[in-house]
Structure formats: structure tokens, C-alpha cells
From Swiss-Prot:
It holds the Pfam family Ribosomal_L27A. It comes from the Bacteria. The lineage of its organism: Bacteria, Bacillati, Actinomycetota, Rubrobacteria, Rubrobacterales. This is Large ribosomal subunit protein uL15. Residues 22-35 have a biased composition (Gly residues). Part of the 50S ribosomal subunit.
Length: 152
């Protein structure tokens, strides 16, 4: 067998459709474009948002103003798992970090979870809390109980 004897497997290659090459081919004369009209002409194409004459979607919807237009919002905003100060009382230990919160079922098990401690509820023992963010009220309640709020 030589390279010039190789050919692709039968059915793996489709022949190009040759249009405008005589009536007997089935694609002569109008080349599969029908009779007249915009789609029968060369060099014309309806723009992508054209909806056949009805009012297009981008014109039916109102224009958004200000920050809602998306200029000032980040593409991927940070999403925090919220944990209230009152829920920390159920977690054992002097130091409460992400592993302890996961074990208690207060946050998702994903490794890249961001945690924010919020100020709802009370805590009555001094604990060191490690999280990505704290609300002002949460930080004040933790420190008032004699604990520390450490930002990761």
C-alpha cells in the first residue's frame, strides 16, 4: 500500500453541493434560492435582531439608567455565606474558623466559600472568630464578650 492508494472510508466525506450547474442537477437556474425576494439576491442578509417587522426585543425593553446598566457592577461579585453571631454559640471551642463552621453545618462544604459574620443574636463567651468579613454589629458583639474577630 502506498500513500497515493489511500482514500477516506466510504461515507466519511460529503461532496460539496455545486449549485447553478444546469437544470439536471436539481440546483440549476435559481440555485436553491427560490424565485425573487431579498433572500434570492446576492450580498444581502437580514440583521440578526430582525424579527420580521414586529418591534424587536431590544426596542421593546426600557433602557436602564445609572448603575443598573452594568458599568459599575463587577462581573463576578463576591458571594458570602452569612452566619449570625447567635449561631456561633452552638459551635464548640475557643477558636471558630471555617472548618468548625463546616462541621456544624452552618456554611457550604465548598473549599472556596466566603463567610461573613452578621450581628443577629447574642454570644456570651469569649471566642476567636476567623472569617472573611464581619458586620460592624457582629464585630462589636464578639469583642464585647471578650473575644476577637480575625479577618482571613
Amino acid at each position: 500500500m502506498r500513500l497515493n492508494e489511500l482514500s477516506p472510508p466510504p461515507g466519511s466525506r460529503r461532496a460539496r453541493k455545486r449549485v447553478g450547474r444546469g437544470e439536471g442537477s436539481g440546483y440549476g437556474k435559481t440555485s436553491g434560492r427560490g424565485q425573487k425576494g431579498a433572500k434570492a439576491r446576492s450580498g444581502t442578509k437580514a440583521y440578526t435582531t430582525y424579527e420580521g417587522g414586529q418591534m424587536p426585543l431590544q426596542r421593546r425593553l426600557p433602557r436602564l439608567k445609572g448603575e443598573a446598566r452594568g458599568r459599575h457592577t463587577p462581573a463576578h461579585p463576591k458571594v458570602y455565606d452569612p452566619v449570625n453571631v447567635g449561631e456561633l454559640a452552638a459551635v464548640e471551642g475557643d477558636t471558630i474558623g471555617l472548618d468548625e463552621l463546616r462541621a456544624a453545618g452552618l456554611i457550604r462544604k465548598k473549599a472556596d466559600t466566603l463567610v461573613k459574620i452578621l450581628g443577629d443574636g447574642e454570644i456570651d463567651r469569649p471566642v476567636t472568630v476567623r472569617a472573611h468579613a464581619f458586620s460592624r454589629a457582629a464585630r462589636e458583639k464578639i469583642e464585647a464578650a471578650g473575644g476577637r474577630a480575625e479577618v482571613l
